[in-house]
Amino acid sequence: MKYRTMGKLGIKSSAFGLGCMRFNGAASGDSVIDEQKAVSLIRRAIDGGVTYIDTAYVYLDKTSEIVLGKALLDGYRDRVTIATKVPPDQVSSRADLERILSEELEKLQTDHIDFYLMHALNKQKWEHMKAIGACEFFDDMKREGKSATSAFPSTAPMRNSNIS
């Protein structure tokens, strides 16, 4: 396995990551997870050198993080970096951000998330997140040790957009 250091964070992570959006049949719309198989798959990936695992609050009807949390018991959490995502379209206040973070930490059975991302961000959602104080929320998370960093993955074109 090849590893890379993530920017200025100094976090060493595998070049190959494991995405937890689709487990057994979820690609065809089936969101019922065979938990035993999914946990086994995640642990085999980690045992094989994968250290970067990606999930999100909404994946698999909000069950992906639960299964990942179970897979990361027995010392597996200490071997990985977790990236998960807050859904901008499901938050309307800082209280919503705090509630979702609390749910995610509980489901993942951890006290911190390494990479906390704003999910499916586009310009409109970015403006919404800024308006409800998401940037300050993410800064507070980092200060409190609940996140190493925050970011905004995007599949939508935002070229030439000012994100400040």
Residue ranges of predicted features:
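Short N-terminal micro-motifs specific to bacterial/archaeal maturation
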Residues: 29, 58-59, 88, 125, ...
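Structural motif corresponding to the early beta-alpha repeats
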Residues: 59, 75-94, 119
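Proline-rich low-complexity regions
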Residues: 14, 74, 87-88, 107
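Conserved radical SAM core fold
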Residues: 23-25, 87-88, 120-123
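N-terminal binding-site loop/beta-alpha segment at the start of enzyme catalytic domains
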Residues: 1-80, 137, 143
